[in-house]
Design a protein with these regions (language model features):
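C-terminal, non-catalytic "cap/extension" segments appended to globular domains
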Residues: 2-122
Length: 122
């Protein structure tokens, strides 16, 4: 929804709820609650300088779930996995591009699959 608003190239002069319904048609999983107007209710993504920053939490959740899936697969207390995580993620800080470090630990780029599974979606 926020991207629908942020990528408009013309000023909006219409019914906000109707605009939301149109913007959500491709992605909404559940029917909207009558009289709900997310644009004015979800301040995290709709106002102030925080709006784009909200997505950093979602990116962090993807990385968290994906990395933890390695531990779950190979054993939560697997020393080799723990050492690789320490050597390739924790000890490197900003010395290399984060994706380079993550792929060195994980062997691939992160995917959303582990997060979807953890959240009971898949």
């Amino acid at each position: 929804l926020d991207m629908a608003w942020y990528t408009r190239d013309k000023a909006f002069d219409g019914d906000v709820r109707e605009y939301e319904r149109e913007a959500w048609k491709r992605t909404q999983l559940l029917p909207p609650v009558k009289e709900t107007c997310m644009t004015v209710q979800f301040g995290h993504i709709m106002s102030g300088g925080y709006s784009a920053g909200y997505y950093s939490y979602k990116c962090a959740e993807v990385l968290d779930a994906d990395a933890f899936s390695v531990f779950k697969k190979k054993g939560i207390f697997n020393q080799d996995v723990a050492q690789s995580f320490r050597d390739n993620i924790l000890s490197k800080g900003g010395t290399e591009h984060p994706m380079t470090l993550y792929k060195r630990f994980r062997g691939q780029e992160p995917t959303i699959h582990a997060l979807l599974k953890r959240n009971g979606i898949k």
